[in-house]
Each structure stands twice: as C-alpha cells, then as structure tokens.
Amino acid sequence: MSVLEKTSDMSLSVRSADPLRGILLKVISVFFFVAMATMLKATQTIPSGEMVFFRSFFALLPVLLYLGWKGRLRHAFATKRPLGHVLRGLVGVASMSLGFFALTRLPLPEATAINYATPLLIVIFSALLLGERVHYFRWTAVVIGLVGVIVILWPRLTIFAGGAALGEAEAVGALAALMAAVLSAFAMMAVRNLVHTERTETIVTYFFISASILSLLTLPLGWVWPTPEQAALLIGAGFFGGVGQLLMTSSYRYADMSVIAPFEYVSLILTIIIGFVIFADVPTLPMLAGAVIIVASGIAVILRERWLGLDRARAKEASTP
C-alpha cells in the first residue's frame, strides 16, 4: 500500500444525494489518514513490515465493530474468491511496506505527493493490460501528471543528479515511494476485479486479515520491541486507518466518486503543515511544483470522467423510448 492509499476501493453506489455531507465525510477521512501517516512516520525506527502489521491488525477493530453494529458482520467472511483476496493481499502488503519505508526516508508531503501517481498509473495499466479505451485527453493528463512525478523525484535520484543529490537515503526513499504507487495501482486493479463477485465489506475485511498474516513473514527480517510511546503510535495508526476507511466508505453513499475524489488532495495541504510543524520538513520548490502538476492532472482526469458520465447519461435518456 502506498503511503496514504486506502486499503481497498470501498466506494458504494450513491443511496441518497447529499454532496455536502459526502464531501465533509471525505475531508474528515483525509484527516484520519494523514494522522495515520504522521503516527507511522513518528516511529521511524520500526521496520516497515512491523508497521504493516499494526496498521492492518488494529484497523480491523473499528471495521468489525461497525459491521457488527450494522448487522453485516456475517457477510464480511462470505467469499467466492479466496485466492483473489490472497493475491490482492500480497500486492497490497508489498505496496504498504514500500510506502511506509518511504515515510521513514522522505518528508511527509513529498511521500504523499508521489503517492498521487497511483490513479495515473491505473489509467496506464488499465489500457495496456486490460485493453480499456483511453482517449487523447486522458493520455495527455496522465503524461503531464507523470512529468510532475519526475519533477519531484529528480533531485532525489543521486544517479542522475550530477553531484547535487540530496542523499542516498532520500534517493532510496523516493524510489520506494514510486514503487509503492506502482504496486498500489495493481492492487486497485485487483480490487476492481474482485468487486464483480465480492461485497465491499468482504474485500476490506479479508485484506486487513491477509495483510496482518502476511506481514508476519517479515519477522525474520528483524522486528523490534516498540517502546510504550511507539506502541501507542502504531496502535493509533491502525485504529485511525480503520476509522478513515469507514468514513471514506460513507462519503461515497452521498455523492458520486467524481464529486468526492478531488478532495483527496486536501491531504497535501495537511501534510505540508504537519511536516513543517512536527518534523521540521521545509517543502522544496521541486516538490511543490511537481505536486501542483500531479494534482492538476489528477483533477483533470476526474472531471473528464464526470463529463463523459454525464454525456453517456444524456445519450441514454435521449435514446429511451
């Protein structure tokens, strides 16, 4: 999983039109996910595999409590595709591990901005691997967005920076963040495949369970015993991640994804502020410039999808006898 990437696509069909409520829930969920990332970054001496375990295992608590309250707990474990969940778990755990590792090497806003490449990469992989039709406008937006990623990464990559590099640790962190975004895109494509037969709560529950189990495979790589403060931060990160997941799910009940999705970029503002106040991270000009390019291209893709959806709806209405 990438740094702020949600563990699965929990979007639901809109049940009642209340865009303002949906937007509010989305923004609150962003606060929870940013808080989660902040807590994880504050435990920098903890191995990323160990972070994945705490983030996944303790996210189960609010999710299962919510499903029990709604009377949907029994549905969460009914699956027709167990191997599909395992595959999604493997890719998701790898993405999360790389993303959390990047958090320990990069400023918080920079790791967040690189993560924004995920939806752009989904467009590319969907076209190349699934044969989805992508028009000129979306390709242009994707290419521009990837230019933004390069703008952010360039100063970090020592092999290309010609002596002006900012350190080997940052270079490794930048590459880890990029690979996390790539794997996150594949994870989202796996989720897209699962939603044809699986309930939303099933996908989410099995991911947290599989991630908790798979992360234990990193034990031989050297987990450490956390201090009480670190343990509190790790447990808090998991709990906040689970609550953020529920809030994000609820937001899509009240408005279309095309309305809600742009507010994900509120996280950039939050991480810049938190990074400066808590971690003394001063945003660099390449990071800010690249982030603006990525956000602009991402919003362009979202709006384009919305316009196409409206056009398809009008065409359908016009053809209805």
Where are these regions (language model features)?
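Cytoplasmic-side transmembrane-helix entry/capping segments in multi-pass membrane proteins
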Residues: 22-26, 79-89, 134-147, 173-174, ...
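Membrane-interface interhelical linkers
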Residues: 1-28, 60-87, 160-166, 196, ...
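Hydrophobic/small/kink-forming positions within alpha-helical transmembrane segments
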Residues: 30-34, 64, 89-97, 119-124, ...
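Specific transmembrane alpha-helical segments of multi-pass solute transporters/efflux pumps
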Residues: 32, 71-109, 115, 151, ...
